[in-house]
Amino acid sequence: MSLLDALNEPQRQAVMATDGPLLILAGAGSGKTRVLTHRTAYLIEECGVNPYNIMAITFTNKAAGEMRERIDQMVGYGSESIWVCTFHSTCVRILRRYIDRLGFGTNFTIYDSDDQKTLMKDICKRLEIDTKMYKEKMFLSAISSAKDELIDPIEFETRAAGDYVKRKQAQVYREYQQALKQNNALDFDDLIMKTVELFKLDKEVLASYQDRFRYIMVDEYQDTNTAQFELIRLLALKYQNLCVVGDDDQSIYKFRGANIYNILNFEHHFPDATVIKLEQNYRSTQNILDAANAVIANNQGRKEKRLWTDNGAGDKITFEQLDTAAEEADFVARDIARRVRKGEYQYKDCAILYRTNAQSRLFEERFITANIPYKIFGGVNFYARKEVKDLLAYLKTIDNGQDDLAVRRIINIPKRGIGAASINKVALYAQEQEISFYDALCVAEQVPGLGKAAAKIRPFVLFIQSMKAKAKLLSVADLLQEVIETTGYVRELEAEGTDEAEARIENIDELISKAVDYAEVEEAPTLNGFLENVALVADIDSFDENSDYVVLMTLHSAKGLEFPNVYLAGLEDGLFPSYMFITSDNSQAEIEEERRLAYVGITRAKKNLTITSARVRMVRGQTQYGKVSRFVREIPPELLSREIYEPKPKEESIEQSAFQKARKAFRTVPSYGGSGYGKEVGEGYGSTFHSSKATKPVYTKVENQRDFGSAGGTLSYQVGDRVRHIKFGDGEVMAIVSGGRDYEVTVDFDKAGTKKMFASFAKLKKV
């Protein structure tokens, strides 16, 4: 069987176009990964290209892993020499070899967002900046944007001219970069910027990589920023065999620095480029695709394409406009439960996508009440947890003593009796001597005014030195366990004897497991490599397609994923698109970015798509009346199951209906007894359609439900009782405080730790 037999005609053309610049415009679900893997195999098997000369760049570890697996299966022997990496991991591999030419050590540390915040806090304190007026986040954002555009501190300062805030940012940027270099550390933006700097500084290094990577493929090209574009341009400059795959209609990361003009102007940058469109979709039904096509056609800044499929027309798109956001969440919860009960879908087939993270709260509350398993993406990353960061800081210190943030984090973990005053004296001495904090600790007896504290520092230094020696002999997992054992970190947690401490120990066990897994998959595992691997992990990479739970995530997080049953929630003008973009000075460009986001959301659905909106919702504590989003109104009526109807009631009727319902939603909970689940879509909800004969949703007042509890009634439990929560499990009631309309209950759960919650939502059962 030929490599090309499984491909459609445009896909075959893309695979066989091997020489010169190539732009593949790959619509959503059009099989771009298949094209990239087949193209790689075709280069090797049909064109005789050495695998060593091929590079494939993606944006996420998940995508890189999937592509690597497919290439290994297709190519077999020799595939291991192909670079299949993310932009960041590609740059790390290059910098580990040559960054010493820029004055950094090759064992540099990669700072995550928490490290950046800590460093920025130190800099603002040192520069005596009023952080109430100038937020650390503002400085970090300005610096990140500058690096995306390859603007260094000197150029930034030049551009600042007479702008006071820009000049302040320039000052902080300069100090920030100096601190990074002193710590022998790079942030994520530096990884790409420093690689470009290296290539421009050292033509020999650039030439060596140009000769190696004669065939370059870049996935998700529409998401590249200026720095990434320049990196690719430099690498492809000599041989011009650059294949980029992307979809301008899915360019949704402008806020991260993505430049849509990289893909729109590809033919301008590479005049000899071939352009091939992949428009056949293998994911969705034609009705879903027609809706997506109709919406995105309203954008002016795009390359014309129209998705089609052989999957059939499929069901019409369901649109439900509810009176309140609470009713919207209630509708979605009931609809999912009904479909799962009827065997149409499993929970894992369902996803709720929304514009802002704040929208998840009501869905969470309804799912807990309805006993629907769910998971939110975008929560606390595993590697951001205290115990994990503490132990990683030990490993970073062992690997790179120049990393001041890591050393200062663990100098008193566990407590060594080294006071803040002593630490400040060491830090000041390090600054004056222009040495690292760790190097200053090594000569603590020379620090003025340190006195007896130097004796307390000495054991810490000796411990780190001994670990540095052991790091050359032990695996990462064994080294980690040695650190845990010698410091007594876990023993201290065990001594606490709390469920929270037990959960933290489980996280430490998971970190050890991660170290073991790393050693099993890497040919030459190193401590530095492990830390690099951890630093490059993103939250979405942990998405488990096999676990049976409903997924809740923002539309930005959903890109690249697909689900049989999708709910797009909160489709109202003012929320999506947001009021900020509607009223901005550059509103057309902003609205087009939002429309691309809507297009991404629609095309996540494989079989069923439900779009919901609310006539009124609480936003930042204010009542907001929402008109159905323009993106819904751009969908042809014949594709929707019902006609959109937007009545124009008098102002007082709004106050007496929607607003009162919004207030009521915060005082009551829906009854999930026997009324609601199993009804057809649109039944039992406040939907506003011409054809709707639906009654209002049934709500049961809290005070009439003894098990829920309220300040107006009695609770079935008291302090000291054992209770059960639908999500957190069993625990002991520690406190009950009356809050007027409701009780605030504090429960120490066996596994989830201590939680405070309102009795009406908690639905605690005495056990």
For the regions a protein language model found, what residue spans apply to each?
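Conserved RecA-like helicase ATPase core segment
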Residues: 3-6, 42, 218, 226-322, ...
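N-terminal pre-P-loop "Q-motif" helix
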Residues: 4-19, 227
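A basic/glycine-biased coupling hinge at the interface between accessory DNA-binding modules
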Residues: 19-22, 40-215, 237-240, 260, ...
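Walker A/P-loop
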Residues: 20-38
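Conserved Walker B
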Residues: 28, 213-224, 228, 248-249, ...
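Helicase P-loop NTPase motor core
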Residues: 30-36, 99, 271-274, 279-373, ...
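Conserved helicase C-terminal RecA-like lobe
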Residues: 158, 162, 346, 360-372, ...
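C-terminal accessory regions
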Residues: 571-753, 761-766
